[in-house]
Every structure is written in structure tokens, then in C-alpha cells.
Amino acid sequence: MKIGLMGGTFDPPHIGHLLIAEQAKEQLQLDAVWFLPAKLPPHKQSTVTSAAKRLELVRAAVRDNQDFSVSEIEFERETKSYTFDTIRELKRRYPEHAFFFLIGADSLVSLGTWHRSEKLYKEIEFGAVARPGSRYLIPEGARVTAVDMPLLEVSSTDIRQRVARGRSIRYLVPEPVRQLIEEWNLYAT
């Protein structure tokens, strides 16, 4: 099987994440997309929402799509979650699968700073999601396939700010995610 891997903090997951996964699934001819919420993201000092609640938010976001699932692999570690370690472990557990790591094309610029990036390039092919008309440089040694994406301006930061200001997030997040944010009183000031 060809599996797309979508890592992230997902604080909260939103329609942009789901659209990226769907576009990558179609364009890369993936059989499924696995969402990999980071328990302890290496690039952030802290998260707004607990790891357990973020995991539940991702589960709620993908539950209506049979081709999407959530992996808890990064929750098995007590240390920071590095993509290289996660990929190695997934390949060990599922040698019959071919994996593609989905990444925003804008993140290709910093890919060389990722933990063990040179070895990561050898481990996995990247599906780089590009905005219409965008140009990007592919790091030397990285195997990258472009995934076209319609322009969609939505971010987890914006969603948290909207909630804090009492503004609607309807249609920016899947309805089950919106309901959990409301029920748990997340992001409110």
C-alpha cells in the first residue's frame, strides 16, 4: 500500500489539513493517509492544548473519511518526536508499505535543519503541497513530488485567535472538531 503521512501539532486540525490530505491522496495515488499528531513537537516550546486533547481532535477530524486514520506512534515516546525516528519505526513495523511524507512546499526551505535530514532524505519521498503559482527549492538529495493545492488561507493560529475573540470557526474546522473545542472551552480567553 502507498501511505501518505501527515505530521503536525494539529492545535486544532482544520479543513486545510484535510484538503491537503485529500489532494495528496488523489495526486500521489495513495491508498490512505495517516495523521501523525506530535506528542512533543521538537519545533515548539509548548502547545496550547494538551497532547491527549489534540489527539482526540484529530480523531474527530478524520472519523468520517475511511481513507484517513490517526497513528499514535509519536505518543509512544516520552521524548520529542522527530520525523526521522517516526519514519524509521513505521518502515520497520510496516515493511510492505511505501510511505510519502506530506509537507507544505514552504517548509522545504527549512527541511535541511530537521533532525538527521540527510538520512531522512534517503528514508522517504516527500509530497510537497504547493500553493498555485508558488516556486520552491528542493533540498539536494531530497526526493520530492509536487502536490497542487487550491489557495486556502486557514491556519491553526488564526482559528485559536478567532475563538479567543468570540468569532465563529464554523466551516474552518470539521463540525465534530468545532463541537469539541466548544465543549472543552479550548482557546477561549
UniProtKB/Swiss-Prot annotation:
Tell me which Gene3D superfamilies the record gives: HUPs
Protein name (record): Probable nicotinate-nucleotide adenylyltransferase
Name the EC number(s). Answer: 2.7.7.18
SUPFAM superfamilies in alphabetical order:
Nucleotidylyl transferase
**What is the enzyme's class at the highest EC level?**
transferase
The encoding gene is nadD
UniProt function note: Catalyzes the reversible adenylation of nicotinate mononucleotide (NaMN) to nicotinic acid adenine dinucleotide (NaAD).
GO biological process terms on file: NAD biosynthetic process
Q: Name one Pfam family in it.
A: CTP_transf_like
Checking HAMAP family in the record gives: NaMN_adenylyltr
* Molecular function as annotated in GO: ATP binding; nicotinate-nucleotide adenylyltransferase activity
Say which family it is in.
Answer: Belongs to the NadD family.
From the record, give the transmembrane residue ranges: none
The species this protein belongs to is Exiguobacterium sibiricum (strain DSM 17290 / CCUG 55495 / CIP 109462 / JCM 13490 / 255-15)
Q: Does the keyword Transferase apply?
A: yes
Statement: the UniProt record of this protein carries the keyword Transferase: yes
The reaction(s) this protein catalyses: nicotinate beta-D-ribonucleotide + ATP + H(+) = deamido-NAD(+) + diphosphate
**InterPro entries, per database record:** Cyt_trans-like (IPR004821), NadD/NMNAT (IPR005248), Rossmann-like_a/b/a_fold (IPR014729)
Q: In which pathway does it act?
A: Cofactor biosynthesis; NAD(+) biosynthesis; deamido-NAD(+) from nicotinate D-ribonucleotide: step 1/1
Keywords per UniProt: ATP-binding, NAD, Nucleotide-binding, Nucleotidyltransferase, Pyridine nucleotide biosynthesis, Transferase
